[in-house]
Amino acid sequence: PLLHGGGHEFGLRSTTENISGVVGFAKAVQVAGNSDIRYMNKLRAKLIDGLLKIPNVTLNGSKGDERLCNNINVSFNDIEGEAIGGYLDAYGISSSTGSACSSNTLDVSHVLKAIGLSHEQINTSIRLSISKFNTKKEIDYVLEILPKIVEKLRKMTPIKL
């Protein structure tokens, strides 16, 4: 048995479910989740708009509500995503070149490949994630630092992909 006592649920669990508590908790999660999603959507829109002002940057995936509120993937022509990530890290900004579940492989992202990106576009992409704990000030910081990094790396890159 999971809980000892009465014979509910064929002896596996004692007691009666608190249905009103379950329904109330579900509603609280829904309300809290909706406000978090709206907040992250605003941060995401601000970040995307700022990123697209950087020359030769492409948003991977759709721009609107058809994407997750907490995830942005962009490609920077002629700059390896790993190089951008290294510089971002030096400024205290976390990014990745793929999902956490593919971090131990050198394979290109199957998701980016499935939406039609070339090998070069995939290798020049980075992923930025947002949470309900991020602030507008942090988004502004990324948008202040990242264009400088991109400009510096493009000057250092003699070969255009």
Predicted regions and their residues:
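Pyridoxal 5′-phosphate
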Residues: 1-161
